[in-house]
Structure formats: C-alpha cells, structure tokens
Amino acid sequence: MAHKKGASSSRNGRDSAAQRLGVKRFGGQVVKAGEIIVRQRGTHFHPGVNVGRGGDDTLFATAPGSVEFGSRRGRKTVNIVPVARPEA
C-alpha cells in the first residue's frame, strides 16, 4: 500500500468563501428603511430604536434616519435617529 498518492494528486485545495460579516453602515451615516446596518453571527450588537433583527441576527433599519451606536444596560445597541426635515 503506497504512502504517497500518485502524481498530480492532492488532499488540499479547498476553502470556504468568506461570510462578509461586519458593520455595513457606520455611526452618522444616513440610511433608508430596510438597509442592512450590521451582518453578524449572534447578537454582538442589539437592535435599538427603529432597528429590526433578522433571523440570522442581521440588524436593519425600519425607518429612515441617521445611524447611532450606543449602549444600554451594558449591551451595545444600534439606533436610527430620524433626520429632521426642514419645514418649507
């Protein structure tokens, strides 16, 4: 039984694609409703005001406004602060 595989044979050469996780919209950026703010595994960031959480823990905006990162009860949270429209 050979301990070396034949020529041009290898057991390596596989790798999984990256998951593209992380913060997609940073503090102060203006977002529209439905825009993804954070892609994450688990709840590193928790949803705050005007932010929803998807089945895979993705945080998304439920209303238009400005992204704001903060903390509440020792947890990192993400809020959307509505942008004041100038009265015409």
UniProtKB/Swiss-Prot annotation:
Entry's Gene Ontology cellular component terms: cytosolic large ribosomal subunit
The keyword Endoplasmic reticulum is assigned to this record: no
Entry-linked PROSITE patterns: RIBOSOMAL_L27 (PS00831)
Keywords per UniProt: Ribonucleoprotein, Ribosomal protein
Annotated region described as Disordered, given as residue ranges: 1-21
GO biological process: translation
MF (Gene Ontology): structural constituent of ribosome
Similarity comment text for this entry: Belongs to the bacterial ribosomal protein bL27 family.
Cited PANTHER family: LARGE RIBOSOMAL SUBUNIT PROTEIN BL27M, RIBOSOMAL PROTEIN L27
UniProt protein name: Large ribosomal subunit protein bL27
Gene designation per UniProt: rpmA
